[in-house]
Design a protein with these regions (language model features):
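Short, acidic Gly/Pro/Ser/Thr-rich loop/turn segments
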Residues: 28, 57, 109-111, 138-139, ...
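C-terminal accessory subdomain/extension
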Residues: 136-242
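Active-site-proximal beta-alpha core segment in soluble small-molecule metabolic enzymes
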Residues: 1-84, 97-98
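Anionic-ligand-binding alpha/beta catalytic cores of soluble enzymes and soluble regulatory domains
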Residues: 60-154
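Conserved, mostly hydrophobic/aromatic
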Residues: 21, 50, 87, 105, ...
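Active-site metal-binding loops of divalent metal-dependent hydrolases
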Residues: 25, 54, 88, 106-107, ...
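Predominant activation on well-ordered alpha-helical scaffold segments within soluble catalytic domains
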Residues: 9-12, 72, 128-132, 230-233
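Solvent-exposed alpha-helices and their adjacent loops that cap or buttress functional pockets
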Residues: 14, 43-44, 77, 93-95, ...
Length: 242
């Protein structure tokens, strides 16, 4: 993927050949500036895929159309075989944003980047963790660092083998939810590095070694945690097995 005139020069000096070219239509990350499209170095490239990337495709803003028009301008100015502008959210903007190739990313993993795609995509990541220990709290007992949760009455809880080292961040403290056969198991107190405490009231038969599921439907989990759907996926640590 060529992103600059300098890279194009290096490519040609090394013998050239088929390549892809990224054009910056306004996101100001990678890509050749629009005003460099007419450079003779670009005219010498044998370009397969002419690409750009939308900055705000998950929102309904005028800048989407501005970028699409710049992409059309680039397509008209540069010889190429195929073109691509849209990722997952851009696909939902309509065929005018597609070109010959689209680049679904988040949606392949069950993410829903735009409301139009709700109900069309299925969750694919279902993290689970095991209960390491079951405890019986008494009224007045507190849980976890800084004692942010205190039991109001006797309560059965489970210590689960997942924490922020696995990507289950402290933002879930006191508001996250795990499940067993559809039954809610709220997070109690602070999420620790390697463990999280949950309320077992709804599933009193659970014991050490049993597995519970994280509430990880991406749109809902993003709304609850304040994290993006992308962060929720990429945070999942290497300690998870498939």
């Amino acid at each position: 993927m060529i992103n600059s005139l300098h890279q194009a020069q290096l490519w040609l000096a090394a013998g050239g050949g088929l390549c892809d070219l990224m054009v910056d239509s306004g996101i100001n990350r990678l890509g050749l500036p629009m005003d460099a499209l007419g450079d003779e170095i670009i005219a010498r490239l044998d370009i397969d895929l002419l690409m750009s990337h939308l900055a705000c495709a998950d929102e309904d803003v005028p800048f989407n159309e501005i970028q699409r028009q710049r992409w059309e301008q680039a397509k008209a100015q540069v010889r190429h075989r195929r073109s691509s502008l849209a990722g997952s959210s851009g696909i939902a903007l309509g065929a005018a944003y597609h070109g010959e190739l689209t680049r679904p990313g988040l949606s392949l993993y069950g993410g829903v980047p735009r409301p139009e795609l709700a109900g069309e995509l299925r969750q694919v990541a279902f993290p689970e963790a095991a209960i390491m220990q079951v405890r019986e709290l008494q009224a007045g007992d507190s849980v976890g660092y800084n004692s942010t949760y205190t039991a109001a009455a006797p309560q059965r809880v489970g210590v689960v083998s997942i924490g922020y080292a696995d990507g289950y961040l402290r933002c879930w403290s006191g508001k996250g939810m795990l499940h067993s056969a559809g039954r809610p198991l709220p997070v109690l107190g602070r999420v620790s590095m390697d463990m999280t405490v949950i309320d077992l009231t709804a599933a009193p038969e659970l014991s050490e070694g049993d597995w519970v599921s994280l509430d990880y439907a991406l749109p809902e989990a993003a709304a609850a945690s304040g994290l993006s759907q992308y962060e929720l996926l990429t945070l999942l640590g290497r300690r998870f097995g498939r």
